[in-house]
């Protein structure tokens, strides 16, 4: 975003693979700090940290006016509150969605990792607790939404982090299998597990919404999306005959 917290780059979702070559090059260095500080042993083309590198190298608008990197949900909340780039934020669950660049247990950006990534610390948003109040609904967006101005706005949390709470996965050794766009099998732990954070396991590690909650997840990137594709492109629902149940 620019100094006024307005978007100046396209939104890139995690299905995008434009960073594949950069990921392969960065992974070839085998930096141990990734697993040690984030729980993620290697870069991945769906990590926002890699998108940030791509934007810095390829988006002229960002090179000229870029001030902060922001996720989509914090971006919307910040604009509802009328914040500037100086007040840009990210909750600690969504922070861990960056994949690289932070200390997951300390909930802080990692100076060492960001230097490896080539991302300036000053471009990173401040890290908030999900329940922190980041501002109030502005007069402008109160008129747009029909809500009362001054309503407190909290930092919020990541979608998968919240879905774990919805599934009741809040203690170590609890697990859930969810298939939205991506099919994900998630299991809660009490922190980074060295065995699980080995590259060959191809697992991703995140911080949960609540304090001292963490989980690993394995995934099929389009596992849920494939169901819709099958329905829309393979099935001809008009030819499907549903018989009456037998008694």
Q: Would you name each region that the model predicts?
A:
Residues 238-246:
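Residue-level detector of conserved catalytic or cofactor/ligand-binding positions
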Residues 10, 125, 152, 244-245:
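Proline-centered helix-kink/hinge sites
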């Amino acid at each position: 975003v620019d100094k006024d917290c307005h978007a100046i780059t396209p939104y890139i979702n995690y299905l995008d693979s434009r960073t594949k070559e950069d990921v392969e090059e960065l992974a070839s260095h085998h930096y141990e700090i990734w697993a040690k500080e984030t729980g993620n042993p290697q870069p991945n083309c769906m990590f926002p940290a890699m998108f940030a590198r791509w934007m810095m190298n390829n988006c002229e608008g960002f090179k000229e006016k870029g001030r902060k990197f922001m996720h989509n949900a914090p971006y919307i909340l910040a604009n509802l509150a009328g914040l500037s780039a100086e007040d840009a934020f990210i909750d600690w669950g969504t922070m861990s969605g960056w994949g690289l660049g932070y200390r997951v247990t300390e909930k802080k950006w990692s100076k060492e990792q960001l230097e490896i990534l080539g991302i300036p610390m000053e471009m990173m948003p401040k890290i908030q607790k999900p329940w922190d109040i980041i501002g109030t609904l502005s007069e402008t967006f109160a008129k747009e939404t029909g809500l009362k101005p001054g309503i407190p706005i909290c930092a919020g949390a990541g979608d998968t982090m919240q879905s774990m709470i919805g599934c009741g996965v809040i203690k170590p050794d609890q697990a859930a299998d969810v298939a939205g766009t991506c099919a994900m099998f998630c299991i809660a732990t009490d922190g980074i597990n060295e065995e699980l954070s080995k590259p060959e396991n191809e697992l991703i590690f995140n911080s949960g919404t609540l304090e001292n909650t963490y989980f690993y997840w394995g995934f099929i990137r389009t596992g849920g999306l494939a169901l819709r594709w099958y329905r829309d492109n393979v099935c001809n629902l008009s030819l499907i005959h549903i018989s009456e149940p037998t008694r």
